[in-house]
């Protein structure tokens, strides 16, 4: 990719399919609405004295003719001049400015059902099948033939922006010393042969998947993968595990990459990686009991450098892991696209593989296929020092992660729907109750809400720690003996309503997080100092998401997981099924306040307690209705 080193700030425009409906521009919410919602969101989460100070600062910011209105006008002008007024601000803030290492901290993983590979050929057949599915899906993208997504859940039926899909196989996150760059591959009329990178035994190989404008068959791919597996065993050809460098902090990796780029051999190898469609990581055995928790850990960090942690290249958006022991899934660099896009793509691949696996796959004997190429590296002592440092830091990440994949089996979304409640709102309120049960407080909570109803829309935040949720959790724990079941039920309904209303605001572009971010970044561009509203302790607190949550629903046999976003926080990803709910809960062992196992147990207690409350109240409602019917019948009988 010749322009990788250039400053590429502008996102490449995707050509829209003629069948793809136009979606509107993201609105800029009214200033006063956002300021009032901000105060409402934070009032019960900070000390009273601190809130009084914040309220005064916010009122000053929002005064008629004041600074807030000036910044709002600039944002509204920006909306007219750009496709999406918050896109670049959000991308920088959420991902590209973040200096933390990608494993656990940023890159989510999807774990497939465990495969039963009898031998290495089974592993390679699975990988060949998967690569064939990637080619199939990429062909849909290249021809803009992917069916348009429509919104589900709240306000369902609206068409969604499809641009994120075109970053699945054409993007690359380039490390920078202070800020990363999201690079998009430029399409050309006569494309060169497409290739993927195969990681095997910490070595990297180029596998051409199209030769002479002919797509390789699964048999061809299997043949080539067998060659790679054999090449990777050659001890004499073994090179340092350069993929380890991508597990480091972004600034450290940028420094190491600058050193690598001084040598032409390294430049050529980096260029091949940066232009590839995706990675396929042929992992060795993990050496652990293969339950959901341990399989997820293998995808999140590979078990460290002495297992499969160096058999990766984290800058590439799509890494497909195929482990010798049947641990398979996807590791995703999150900056080009959101979770639902990753899930839709993965679902398509798994369906393709299920259909394709019915055929017996044999190696094709095509002698004219060129052998895959091993990527070569020239490693200076400086790079060797970087590799040693990266390996040590990856081990720290591995040891520090406290993770559990927990299946709640007592009920699922079918029971929740019978309560005439959104499963997502119900689970979010249950998570607030669980957190309060563990820590006796609520904290700023992040739940991602898609804004793909708008052009270039990514996500905004549903702030689930509402005042109504706070009233409910206190009723269930602090005021339990004093309140009747009907009073608790009313507070539960209020919490569900508040969560649902905020969700609707978020998906329609009216939530507060993106708006406040836009105002802050416009102020940064136009003034020497940030306005006090953005340096105030309450604003800083509001952006430390101690509870980071996401619903990733899928009917397929797979699940998603990720790490916490702050040192004293939790990641909580969940997949509601008809009769169970799967939770993936993460925290850090360094933090003595948090425990993933403790939160998982609290989630179970909370879900059972809410179910019992619903059952009691529906039972008493049924009895009350029966009594009313009986009284009506008696009056009727008397008249007769």
Swiss-Prot record:
> A GO biological process this protein is involved in?
neuromuscular synaptic transmission
Compositional bias of kind Basic and acidic residues? 1-22
Residues recorded as binding CoA, renumbered to this chain, are: 412-424, 450, 551
Q: What is its EC number?
A: 2.3.1.6
According to its UniProt entry, what is the function of this protein? Catalyzes the reversible synthesis of acetylcholine (ACh) from acetyl CoA and choline at cholinergic synapses.
What top-level branch of life does the organism fall under? Eukaryota
Q: List every stretch annotated Disordered.
A: 1-28
Q: Name one GO molecular function term.
A: choline O-acetyltransferase activity
Q: What is this protein called?
A: Choline O-acetyltransferase
Q: What reaction does this catalyse?
A: choline + acetyl-CoA = acetylcholine + CoA
Family from the record: Belongs to the carnitine/choline acetyltransferase family.
| Classification via Pfam families | Carn_acyltransf (PF00755)
Matching InterPro entries, A to Z?
Carn_acyl_trans, CAT-like_dom_sf, Cho/carn_acyl_trans, Cho/carn_acyl_trans_2
- Which residues are responsible for catalysis? 334 (proton acceptor)
First-level EC class: transferase
User: What are the annotated GO cellular component locations?
Assistant: cytoplasm; neuron projection; synapse
Record keywords, A-Z: Acyltransferase, Neurotransmitter biosynthesis, Transferase
Q: In which tissues is it expressed?
A: Detected in brain and in embryonic retina.
């Amino acid at each position: 990719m010749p322009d990788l080193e250039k400053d590429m700030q502008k996102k490449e425009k995707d050509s829209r399919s003629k069948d793809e409906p136009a979606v509107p521009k993201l609105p800029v919410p009214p200033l006063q609405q956002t300021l009032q919602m901000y105060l409402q969101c934070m009032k019960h989460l900070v000390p009273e004295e601190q809130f009084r100070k914040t309220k005064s600062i916010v009122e000053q910011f929002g005064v008629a003719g004041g600074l807030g209105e000036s910044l709002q006008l600039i944002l509204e002008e920006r909306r007219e001049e750009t496709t999406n007024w918050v896109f670049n601000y959000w991308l920088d803030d959420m991902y590209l400015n973040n200096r933390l290492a990608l494993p656990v901290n940023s890159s989510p993983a999807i774990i497939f059902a465990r495969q039963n590979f009898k031998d290495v050929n089974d592993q390679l057949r699975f990988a060949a099948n998967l690569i064939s599915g990637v080619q199939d899906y990429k062909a849909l993208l290249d021809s803009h033939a992917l069916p348009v997504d429509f919104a589900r859940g709240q306000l369902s039926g609206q068409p969604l922006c499809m641009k994120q899909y075109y970053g699945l196989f054409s993007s690359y996150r380039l490390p920078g010393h202070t800020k990363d760059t999201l690079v998009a591959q430029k399409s050309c009329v006569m494309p060169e042969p497409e290739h993927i990178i195969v990681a095997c035994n910490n070595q990297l190989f180029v596998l051409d998947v199209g030769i002479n404008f002919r797509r390789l068959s699964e048999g061809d791919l299997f043949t080539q993968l067998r060659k790679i597996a054999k090449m990777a065993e050659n001890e004499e050809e073994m090179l340092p595990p350069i993929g380890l460098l991508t597990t480091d902090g972004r600034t450290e990796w940028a420094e190491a990459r600058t050193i690598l780029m001084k040598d032409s051999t390294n430049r050529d190898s980096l260029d091949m990686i940066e232009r590839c469609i995706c990675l396929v990581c042929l992992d060795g055995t993990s050496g652990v009991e293969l339950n959901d928790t341990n399989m997820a850990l293998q995808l999140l960090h590979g078990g460290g450098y002495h297992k499969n942690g160096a058999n990766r290249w984290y800058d590439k958006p799509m890494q497909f892991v195929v482990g010798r022991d049947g641990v398979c899934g996807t590791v995703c660099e999150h900056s080009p696209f959101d979770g639902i896009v990753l899930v839709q793509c993965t679902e398509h691949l798994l369906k393709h593989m299920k259909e394709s696996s019915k055929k017996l796959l044999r190696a094709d004997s095509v002698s004219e296929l060129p052998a895959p190429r091993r990527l070569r590296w020239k490693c200076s002592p400086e790079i060797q020092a970087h590799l040693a440092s990266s390996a040590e830091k990856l081990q720290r990440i591995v040891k520090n992660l406290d993770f559990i994949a927990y299946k709640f089996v007592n009920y699922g979304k079918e029971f929740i729907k019978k309560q005439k409640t959104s499963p997502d709102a119900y689970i979010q309120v249950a998570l607030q109750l669980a957190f309060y049960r563990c820590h006796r407080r609520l904290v700023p909570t992040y739940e991602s809400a898609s804004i793909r109803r708008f052009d270039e829309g990514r996500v905004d935040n549903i702030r689930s720690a509402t005042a109504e949720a706070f009233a409910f959790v206190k009723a269930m724990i602090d005021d339990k003996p004093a309140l009747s079941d009907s009073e608790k039920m009313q507070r539960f309904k209020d919490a569900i309503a508040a969560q649902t209303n905020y969700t609707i605001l978020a998906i329609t572009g009216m939530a507060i997080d993106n708006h406040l971010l836009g105002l802050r970044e416009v102020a940064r561009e136009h003034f020497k100092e940030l306005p006090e509203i953005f340096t105030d302790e309450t604003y800083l607190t509001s952006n430390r998401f101690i509870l980071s949550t996401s619903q990733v629903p899928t009917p397929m046999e797979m699940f998603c997981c990720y790490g916490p976003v702050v040192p004293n926080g939790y990641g909580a990803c969940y997949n509601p099924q008809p009769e169970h709910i799967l939770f993936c809960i993460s925290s850090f062992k360094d933090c003595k306040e948090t425990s993933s196992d403790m939160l998982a147990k609290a989630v179970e207690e909370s879900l059972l307690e809410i179910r019992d409350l619903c059952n009691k109240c529906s039972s008493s409602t049924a009895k009350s209705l029966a009594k009313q019917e009986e009284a009506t019948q008696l009056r009727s009988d008397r008249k007769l």
